[in-house]
Amino acid sequence: MRPPPKSWPPTKGSEPLPNAPRIAPPVSAAPPAGKLHGARALSGPLPWLLPALIMLGLFYLYPIAEALRLAFTDARLFDQTTEPSLDSIRRVSQSAALPVILQNTLVYTVASVLGQLGLGMAIAILVVRAERARLRGTMALRTLVLAAWVIPAIANGVIWQLLFSEAPFGAINSALRMVGFAPVAWLSDPSNAMLSAVIATIWQGTAYSMILLYAALKSIDPALNEAAAIDNATGFERFWFITLPHLRAALLVNAILILIMTLNMFDTILSLTGGGPGRATEVLSLFAYNTVFQSFELGRGAVLSILLLIISLTLTAAMVVFLPRERK
């Protein structure tokens, strides 16, 4: 069989032969619209985001939805039978202890957040200046501060309970006796118990603030401070007009994060004072914990958890407004 000519169909001059067969050019079949849309979806960011979305829904959104459901029931911890009811919400709203607990939460949170921000900034500035001056011991200082952050909150409460102990072996009262001062009822006096809880929380949380602010301080150009020093600016003026404006975003982000952590913290207070004496150190998160695991009232505990969530979201939204925006 002879192969077809190079020009197909056969032509005579520039015109094709009248009876020559015509071969249609190959046509590529287009995929269906549904398959094309699916392929585009699979090649986009959705497959990469799907595991994170599943984990977010499983460990965050589902517990919130379940807490909302339990808040409208009379559920108890070891009782399988639950009925829809508004009794849990009514009992929480009419609780005589709730105003005291909200006041304790406000005092504890504000004092702890301000203390962690202030002390964390002071240590971060000290470390940065010591590094620029090439002083020894900066690594040891950072390690010492970070060691407090590594300790679990329960252990942190136990440590400070021993330090604040009013027994003869209490370290702080022993030091006060040595210098001629009278011992202080750190944990048994309601006016001192909250201060003790705040000190223990600040001691542990300062490292977190120090890390964030240390990174922000390292990003400030040293030439700005050098130029201000040449212009005879004082140390306070350099801090107020150069350092603080550059730390605004880091300070607000740090404040938001430690605000949320402090609002949800109860384990340090649980091991330090147990919420006492009386209700002097009982905060909202500890009240919710005691309601569920001591009173076994799951419905009331869910209401308190939702209340804590609302407070956290409201305060966070109020602080996010002050975050600096990029100018377009």
Region spans (language model):
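Transmembrane alpha-helical segments of polytopic membrane transport and secretion proteins
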Residues: M1-L49, R132-M139, V320-K328
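A structural signal for multi-pass alpha-helical bundles of membrane permease subunits
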Residues: G44-K328
